[in-house]
Regions:
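Long, C-terminal-biased catalytic regions of enzyme "large/alpha" subunits
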Residues: 1-103
Length: 103
């Protein structure tokens, strides 16, 4: 039997599958939600501290919502992240929402 390295951050947590736009799946990663949020906040000219505070709250809310699901689409994550971000900063939410159309 091979020894498996256990990641203490994910040990005991339910793995959630994300269905991407081209129908492949990957595991949910809260760091990606945080990173996307942070990028939008910084482009909306928020300070590092403001961006960190907002994105910490947003990523926790999104993760809490996702933990209730077995699988979600990336589009659902996009919508919930936009809604949560809009609660804190309309400009950052707009940038997050429209960046997807550009990329």
């Amino acid at each position: 039997m091979k020894n498996k390295k256990i990641d203490k951050k994910t040990a005991g947590k339910k793995e959630i599958s994300i269905v991407k736009r081209r129908w492949h799946t990957e595991l949910y990663d809260e760091r990606k939600v945080y990173g996307s949020c942070y990028y939008a906040c910084r482009n909306a000219h928020l300070s590092e501290k403001e961006a960190e505070e907002i994105c910490s709250k947003v990523s926790k809310s999104v993760t809490k919502w996702i933990r209730k699901k077995k699988a979600v689409s990336s589009n659902e994550i996009f919508k919930i992240l936009t809604e949560e971000l809009r609660k804190y900063n309309e400009d950052a939410a707009f940038l997050y929402e429209t960046h997807r159309d550009i990329s």
